[in-house]
Amino acid sequence: LGGKATFEVGNKRFEKVGGRPNVLAGLPHSVYMPAGVDFTIKAEGAVQVALPSAPSDLEIETYVIGPNLVTTGVWGAANFRRDFRQILTEAGQPQLPARRLIVGETITPSGNWSTYPPHRHEKDDLPREAYHEEMYYFKVLPADGFGICRYYNDDPVEENFTVRDNTILMAPKGYHTVVSAPGYTTYLIWFLAGEHRTQATVEDPNLSWVTKTVPMLTELGH
């Protein structure tokens, strides 16, 4: 997430991986490690590292995902515009071998919504929907700010959470969305795990019309 660290994975050593001072100051560096290996992470000064994992039977060598392999772009438009960084996804990094795990980052500007329209990924019904467990780790900048995260489904179940700096939330099922408080930027790194690495989601049908406005809003400069 920030700083540099040296990784020793089995008999391999990766010196001073990283570089950005914080999550907003550049693209991430990552190290993909196969299951069952011993590893050591040595901090090279102040460092913050995220360690997502998922069961895997893939036998591969450890590899580094540098900023040159990170896919960036924009999702949405206007006040639901957010920037994404795909670190380990089937769509963004099809050349990288992985099993079950999907990783990326999203930066939501002041007052904007993310994961909007709200979507879900709670059952395997490909190509329409793929089941994935999901976890978010949030940073809020400046750190005294907050955001709001909403989960809901058809049961009915509805939960709303205040998101603060260093909040961790899970999204095992249901529709979910996040909004940044005005004056604050919300960063989140998302980890998904499932049998399929294809990201197929279903939007809330009551709000899915919003997606159809993106081309028009983009053309108008929003």
Model-derived features: positions:
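Active-site cofactor/substrate anionic-group-binding motifs, chiefly glycine-
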Residues: 15-21
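Ligand-binding loop in jelly-roll beta-barrel domains
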Residues: 22-60, 164-165, 173-199
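Structured loops at beta-to-helix junctions and adjacent beta-edge loops in soluble globular domains
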Residues: 52-55, 106-107, 111, 141, ...
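A short glycine-rich, His/Asp/Glu-containing loop-to-beta-strand
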Residues: 79-135
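Secondary-structure boundary elements
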Residues: 40-45, 58, 94-97, 142-145
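Glycine- and acidic-residue-biased ligand/ion/polar-headgroup-sensing regions
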Residues: 1-15, 33, 110-111, 122-167, ...
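Double-stranded beta-helix
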Residues: 22, 46-89, 150-152, 189-222
